[in-house]
Amino acid sequence: RLADHHRLFDGLRVNVITNEQIYNEFSSGSPDPAAIRDFARLLYQRPAAGNKLRYLLLFGDGSYDFKDRVPFNTNKVLTFQTKESLNTVYSYASDDFYGILDANEGNDAVGLIDIGIGRFPVNTAEEAKMAVDKCIFYATNSSLNMGDWRNKLCFVADNGNSNTHFRQVEKQICPLIENIAPVYNLDKIYIDAYKPVSTPSGQKCPDANAGITSNVQNGVLLINYTGHGGETGWAEEGILTISEIKSWTNYKNMPVFMTATCEFSRYDDPDPARVSAGEHVFLNPQGGGIALFTTTRLANAGTNIGLTLYFYDTLFSKSNGEYPRFGDVISYAKNRMGGFDASLVRNFVLLGDPALRLAYPKYNVVTTHINGKPINQEMDTIPAMQAVELKGIVTDGSQHALTNFDGELDIKVFDKVRTLSTLGSLPGDYPDKYTLQDNFVYQGRATVTDGEFTVQFMVPRDIDYSYGPGKISYYAHNDVMDANGFSKKLMIGGSGNESTDNVGPEISLFLNDEKFVNGATVGDMPLLVAHLSDVSGINTIGNSIGHDIVATLDGDNTTSVVLNSYYSANLDSYQSGVVNFKMPQLPEGKHTLTLKVWDVFNNSSETTIS
């Protein structure tokens, strides 16, 4: 099925070959990794460029036990293992061996990689079907999987080591992304930015765990982790665990993972009961990740950062008008490492389909006017409490308007970049500054007709009044195609005219659906549904002033939950929208639920149901 998908969807020539066919032809019927490489080299050496091998998918788990001496072995598709078996750095499994195909290369996996290689670490027919289903669903645009999660990247950094991991992400990786792919919105989860919590099992950072889970569940295109890790998760604080991975239900918005850490995805243990955290990410049938660029053994921080920078430079660069496939990304990035110790690069593998691409939006969204002024004129300044009108178009790669594009536009207008600081909680670490652009001026939805759109909103009173550039972020889609774009031609700051609005929002609060009545019986995890409206707009800016959408259970403020991110504006309206939030598990008995909401001029309302 996966081969048929690539034939029909991508126009690729695809062959499906069994282990036995290869062994019979190239190693007298005996299992041998060299046989797989020889077969790949045969296809690679074909003279016609259109027939030359480009991608190799190893469809099955691997094991360091080639000869099946261990009972219940996971030896489905052979792995290449180093001669070294005692040194934990220089002993590793690698699939690169199968792709080093030029003459006089390949001995001990030395040389440049000529094809893109990935692996599905599957052991059963059920796992295999699940992996194929996920890939086809991810690659096929539909109303089910398109969304502005495709505009978001998340970067996670460990603490310790004198801020090494933090500095690699904040000072090197993120600036690169902001330079080569500024259309994407960055979230940052730095362990040292959160106050540690002491527990019987050591220091934990539950806010970091919650941030990672929120990104996965709500949708993010890619998650990058830099720091210490292992087969059971990330960081000494356990900011990502196997139990958390298995609980993810994000099938409609599966991210790619880049993990510059140690043996997070060791797949070659022969014990089928010993499944690494990275494998669980890929094998989660309810979501998890669509692919991982990840490690099978110990890794080195110095090599990790070099490979990571090349990875992103390749991932977000077009060649002949097209973005690379996953196999291209990992092979090009490794080859660009050049003089680095090969063993510290070879242990990075692709768990996923090498012929798949990241879910890049295909087309562009462009702002044409702000408050009636063409965007190419002097940057407009938008103060608090002022009405704003944006106009724009959807374009193709040549910047020609797509007049046949009808769909919806998701828009986020960000306030200025803010500067925060880490805490320096561990010995050897120190407080260090980092930037984040995460406060919203407006979030909404608009109709796109014949490739054109208009958005109107009111700037909240709660913005940062200093002057600086904001960011407009767009994501447009219909049932078959999508587009994204951004603009920083928007100066935000200062104060406009005082408002005469002194009336708070209207709130209609329900559990599960609009048929709910006070006193009704519900399950232990009901859905909070709140319809909100206000003539000036709902405040979801979330800048810590306290004017958030907040739900409180039984009048206990310790249970309060901020619901700004669960608010969705109604189509073509900044004055109304709905909150949908799955409540945490409730104990049996009677309860009350209070919802407090503010408008953009800081008038509040609240309502309570029981």
Give the residues covered by each predicted segment.
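Cysteine-dependent hydrolase recognition
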Residues: R1-R445, T449-M458, S466-G468, A476, ...
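Flexible, low-complexity linkers/stalks enriched in Thr/Pro that connect modular domains
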Residues: A359, L490-P505, F510-N512, I609-S610
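Short, solvent-exposed loop/edge segments of extracellular or virion-exposed proteins
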Residues: I370-N376, S508-F516
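Short coil/turn motif common to extracellular beta-sandwich-like domains
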Residues: P383-E389, T521-L528
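Short amphipathic, basic-aromatic surface patches that mediate peripheral association
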Residues: G392-L402, E514-V517, H531-I541
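Solvent-exposed loop/turn segments flanking beta-strands in beta-repeat/beta-sandwich domains
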Residues: H400-D410, L420-G424, V535-G555
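Exposed aromatic-hydrophobic patches
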Residues: T454-P460, V578-P584
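Short, well-structured beta-strand segments within conserved domains
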Residues: G470-Y474, P505, P526-A530, G577, ...
